[in-house]
């Protein structure tokens, strides 16, 4: 049994001051994936005994960035998608393991007034193609902040957010296309009708207190792994970021 954790830490240095190390040890994951590390190399000595660590930093300081801590030494590690326009923001890390690929991703936000929506659409197509190419060789597990609430059940206030980044028809359609290409939303696999479970809450308007959240952090797996899925969990009780960790357990 393997346990995977994914957490958008909204700045790892800040999260360190809010109990990150305790959470890391308590969750005891085989693979612990981070998004929005917001740091450069050498700014934090984040090493954990028994784990190999891999970092992809954005060129812009204090922005984006991903990391993976792995108990298993991978066969290979790839940073980015291998596409120039997508590979300056530290958004993707791929580990090749014996029987699967693990990808962590911090999907670009479409931003206010949807000024980055066109770029986001291109990213979605290129990222999906990247995953499908990997899948020709081995099954894929992809986790991270995908910056989209897929269905109305995935956010507290769907009606008022229809035209907002993360819940536009365009973004939701791309997510549907990704699933239809052969991927399983593992949380919905186990809890297809569960309402009121979210992974991100705005820091404004006491959103977390009111549970006015969005489920935008996911574990997706190749459909071929469905019969190996053992559990999915969203750790809504864990603080330290505006997101909470999400979990997948799988028999591999």
Where are the predicted features?
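N-terminal, active-site-proximal structural segment of metallo-dependent hydrolase catalytic domains
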Residues: 1-48, 58-64
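Active-site-proximal beta-strand elements of phosphoester/diester hydrolases
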Residues: 2-10, 99-111, 143
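Active-site beta-strand/loop signature of hydrolases that rely on acidic residues for catalysis
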Residues: 8, 24-42, 102, 131-152, ...
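Structured beta-strand-rich core segments of catalytic domains in phosphoester-bond hydrolases
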Residues: 38, 43-110
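Metal-dependent phosphoesterases centered on the DNase I-like endonuclease/exonuclease/phosphatase
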Residues: 52, 126-212, 216
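Conserved beta strand-loop-helix elements of the APE1-like EEP
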Residues: 61-76, 197, 205-227
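Active-site beta-strand termini and strand-to-loop segments that position acidic
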Residues: 71, 95-98, 222-223, 241, ...
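Surface-exposed cleft-lining segments at the edges of enzyme active sites
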Residues: 82-83, 108-124, 159-164
């Amino acid at each position: 049994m393997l346990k995977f954790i994914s957490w958008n830490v909204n700045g790892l240095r800040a999260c360190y001051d809010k109990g990150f190390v305790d959470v890391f040890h308590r969750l005891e994951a085989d693979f612990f994936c981070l998004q929005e590390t917001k740091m450069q190399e050498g700014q934090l000595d984040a090493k954990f005994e028994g784990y190999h660590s891999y970092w992809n930093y954005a060129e812009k300081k204090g922005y984006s960035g991903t990391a993976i801590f792995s108990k298993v030494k991978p066969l290979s590690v790839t940073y980015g998608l291998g596409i120039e326009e997508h590979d300056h923001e530290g958004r993707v890390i791929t580990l090749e393991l014996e029987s699967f690929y693990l990808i962590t991703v911090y999907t670009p936000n479409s931003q206010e007034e949807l000024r980055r929506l066109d770029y986001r659409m291109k990213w979605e197509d290129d990222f999906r193609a990247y995953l499908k190419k990997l899948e020709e060789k081995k099954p894929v597990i992809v986790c991270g902040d995908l910056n989209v609430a897929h269905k109305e059940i995935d956010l507290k206030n769907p009606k008022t957010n229809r035209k907002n980044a993360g819940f536009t028809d365009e973004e939701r359609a791309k997510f549907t296309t990704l699933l239809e290409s052969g991927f399983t939303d593992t949380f919905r696999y186990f809890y297809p009708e569960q309402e009121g479970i979210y992974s991100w809450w705005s820091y404004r308007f006491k959103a977390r207190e009111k549970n006015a959240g969005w489920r935008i952090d996911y574990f997706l797996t190749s459909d071929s792994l469905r019969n190996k899925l053992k559990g999915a969990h969203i750790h809504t009780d864990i603080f330290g970021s505006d997101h909470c960790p999400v979990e997948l357990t799988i028999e591999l």
